Amino acid sequence: MTQKDISSTIKFDKMCVTYYANKLKSCKDRGIEFNLTYTQVKNMLRAKRCQYTGITLTKSQGSLQRPTDVTIERIDSSKPYETGNVCAVSFAANQAMNNMEQWFGRNSINAMKKMTKYVSKHNAKLK
């Protein structure tokens, strides 16, 4: 392993620890159940593409999140963060889904998520 690889691994591990701690605190503050292990979160943060849009995901470089930075989204926001109810998406997609759910309600947003997944899978087949 090169010095650059080691540095990159340490940087990613540090980002994952920070993300996990912040997510735990955020969920506790908002009264949302969080049932994912650190390893599960770390594996999800390795995602290369947004599950909703298919765009290439980036890793957070600081306290401000970029639109393409990876984050973990609950598929059904009425349920906890747990296996089967989470996916890796871009920060922008996560924010858009949250805003649309507030505007249109959960049923509309769940239909939109299904449609987005379908389009993303279809686009992947075309490549």
Residue ranges and their predicted role:
Residues 32, 54-88, 97:
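Histidine-centered nuclease catalytic patch
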Residues 50-53, 92:
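Short, cysteine/histidine-rich loop/knuckle motifs that typically chelate Zn2+
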Residues 82-94, 117-127:
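Short Fe-S-cluster ligation motifs
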Residues 27, 49, 98, 123-127:
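Residue-level signal for secondary-structure boundary elements
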Residues 58-60, 86-114:
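Short Cys/His-centered divalent metal-binding micro-motifs
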Residues 1-51, 103-119:
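Contiguous alpha-helical segments
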